[in-house]
Amino acid sequence: MFQKKTYAVFLILLLMMFTAACSGSKTSAEKKESETEKSSDIAQVKIKDVSYTLPSKYDKSTSDDQLVLKVNVAVKNTGKDPLNVDSMDFTLYQGDTKMSDTDPEDYSEKLQGSTINADKSVEGNLFFVVDKGKQYELNYTPESYGDKKPKSVTFKIDGKDKKILATADKLQDSAKALSAYVDVLLFGKDNADFEKITGANKNEIVNDFNESAKDGYLSASGLSSTYADSKALDNIVNGIKEGLSKNSSIQAKTTSISKDEAIVEATVKPVDASSLSDRIEDKVKDYYSKNSSASYEEAVKYALQVYPEEFKKLGPASSEKTVEVKMKKNDIDQWQLDMDDYRAAELVEAFIKE
């Protein structure tokens, strides 16, 4: 009676739970950045912001302990002739070592080559592979024309500056947010950082989650509330959470960030549900053998009654599954699960192995 359907019901249940729950609030915040400015004989350069970010997933040349220094610059033509500006006009040194420039995940973020007329400006980002917390020098040499070489300008950047280091500390916030969602929704745990990281009201999101879970179970199983009352559904939801919390796990790591999107690599140790349908079926057969006059409705209610305990008995699977999940950032740097992305479903599916 419950064979083949149990697995699909479980997955649809989790998907509906996530869909209803994963919508956080957004508020605006004003950001103010100090500017550093220097001039050559034909150009004025401003460093508007410096931060650490993660290498692009396409950049295979970086080591695991390296980061990317992202420098936002504005260049103004203070000469009389048109000025060509390109990211290649900039070099970065870490000590005496010239560091490699790199491309971001979204190439449009990088300072693009352009020609600007007198008194006009262009702004963009520079990306360099660096070791975190070092001293850097950014050099800008305007493109030369004829025999006269324009003056270069050099900026010193302190990679140990607290403000810059703080950007490195935030690089795993999207991974922490994903783990927090799993904690409070799938595992039924408390997570003290949930609201700070995601911007969602924990009580509201858990209540929405639980109500959606019960509706989702009825919808996916095709059962009416006649068979599954609110108490039975509460027990099923709580049993699933307890079973997942006890016998599954997740390790999350942010692997790339582009603007307001991040890719988090989630390595999931799922529960092994290969025996669940058969075990519930055996329970129902045993029930019928002892209650030969039982109706179909009574048998279904019994199956729903034993479902939570049987689920909690599921052990961890012998293998892990790694999936990529997209997270989206609101305007005050809080990370939320992107339910419009197909990978959210893959994350849910990763928690159970048939």
From Swiss-Prot:
> Which GO cellular component terms are attached?
membrane raft; plasma membrane
Question: What is the membrane topology here?
Answer: Lipid-anchor
Q: Which residues form a coiled coil?
A: none
Report the subcellular localization: Cell membrane; Membrane raft
Q: What is this protein called?
A: Uncharacterized lipoprotein YcdA
Q: Kindly indicate whether the keyword DNA repair belongs to this entry.
A: no
S-diacylglycerol cysteine: lipidated positions: 22
Asked if the keyword Glycosyltransferase belongs to this entry, the reply reads: no
Q: Which UniProt keywords apply?
A: Cell membrane, Lipoprotein, Membrane, Palmitate, Signal
Lipidation feature positions (N-palmitoyl cysteine): 22
Q: Which residues belong to the signal peptide in this entry?
A: 1-21
**Which Pfam families does this UniProt record tie to the protein?**
DUF4352, DUF5105
Gene name of the record: ycdA
